[in-house]
Design a protein with these regions (language model features):
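Conserved donor NDP-sugar-binding/catalytic core segment of glycosyltransferases
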Residues: 99-138
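N-proximal low-complexity "stem/linker" segments adjacent to membrane-targeting elements
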Residues: 1-29
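A conserved acidic beta->alpha catalytic loop
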Residues: 42-51
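Conserved nucleotide-sugar donor-binding catalytic segment
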Residues: 145-203
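Short, acidic, metal-binding catalytic loop of nucleotide-sugar glycosyltransferases
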Residues: 28-37
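Short aromatic/hydrophobic "clamp" motif used to bind/position activated sugar donors
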Residues: 87
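Glycine-rich, basic loop-to-helix element that forms the pyrophosphate-binding segment
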Residues: 65-82
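The conserved acidic donor/metal-binding loop of glycosyltransferases
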Residues: 91-95, 120
Length: 203
C-alpha cells in the first residue's frame, strides 16, 4: 500500500479493536468524504474481521508491535504512524459527515498557528443522528467561551470551556502534528486522558 494516496496532508487514523460491528460503517463514512483523504487502520488486535473490511475498502492495516500497553499507547501509535501533518484519530464506532475533511481544510487555512481542530456532534440512536441527547446539549452549552472566534485563542477561554468536564468528543478532533510533534497523548490518567490532553493543549 502507498500510505498517502491523496495530497490533503491529512490522515484518518482509525483505531480498531477486536471485531466491532461498527467498523465497516465508520470506514464507509470516511470513504464518502467530499474531499478524498488518506485512511489507515491501526490495531493492537489484528484479526480476519478487521483485515476483510480493510481489503474490501482498500485501506492499509498497521499492527502495533508494542501492544498491550493501554488505549493511550494505541492512540499514540496511530497518531505517530500517520505520515501527514493533520491527523484525526478516528474511533471504530463513530461516523463522519461527508463534509468533515472539506470543512477542516477550509477552516485551518485561516489560522497558521492552530494546534487542534474539532467539531460538534450528535449521537446515533437506532440509526438516527438527527436528535441531540442531554450530554450533547450540555457539552455544546459548556463550549460557549470559545464560540466567539475572535477571542477563542484566549488561554483563559479555552481552559474555561473545559473546566466543567470534557466538552469535546475525542474522535472529532484533528491534531496539527506538524506543530505538536509526535506523542501528543501524555496523560497520567487511565480514564479521561483525552480531556487531560485537551486541557494541556489549551495551556
Amino acid at each position: 500500500y502507498k500510505m498517502n494516496k491523496y495530497n490533503t496532508n491529512h490522515t484518518f487514523a482509525v483505531c480498531a479493536y477486536k471485531e466491532s460491528p461498527y467498523l465497516e460503517e465508520c470506514i464507509r463514512s470516511l470513504k464518502a468524504q467530499t474531499v478524498q483523504t488518506n485512511i489507515g487502520i491501526y490495531t493492537s488486535t489484528p484479526n480476519d474481521h478487521i483485515q476483510s473490511i480493510a481489503d474490501r475498502y482498500d485501506v492499509p492495516v498497521y499492527v502495533n508491535p508494542d501492544a498491550g500497553k493501554g488505549i493511550q499507547a494505541d492512540w499514540n501509535f496511530a497518531y505517530n504512524s500517520a505520515d501527514t501533518d493533520y491527523v484525526t484519530v478516528a474511533h471504530q464506532d463513530d461516523t463522519y459527515e461527508p463534509g468533515y475533511v472539506e470543512t477542516l481544510l477550509s477552516s485551518v487555512k485561516r489560522y497558521e498557528d492552530w494546534s487542534m481542530y474539532y467539531t460538534d456532534y450528535t449521537p446515533i440512536k437506532d440509526g438516527d443522528s438527527s436528535r441531540r441527547d442531554v450530554n450533547s446539549r450540555i457539552r455544546r452549552f459548556l463550549r460557549w467561551p470559545v464560540k466567539n472566534t475572535a477571542k477563542a485563542d484566549s488561554i483563559r477561554r479555552k481552559k474555561l470551556s473545559l473546566c466543567m468536564g470534557n466538552t469535546i468528543v475525542c474522535p472529532l478532533v484533528t491534531y496539527n502534528k506538524g506543530r505538536l510533534g509526535d506523542t501528543v497523548f501524555t496523560s497520567e490518567y487511565n480514564f479521561n486522558l483525552d480531556w487531560d490532553t485537551f486541557y494541556k493543549l489549551a495551556c
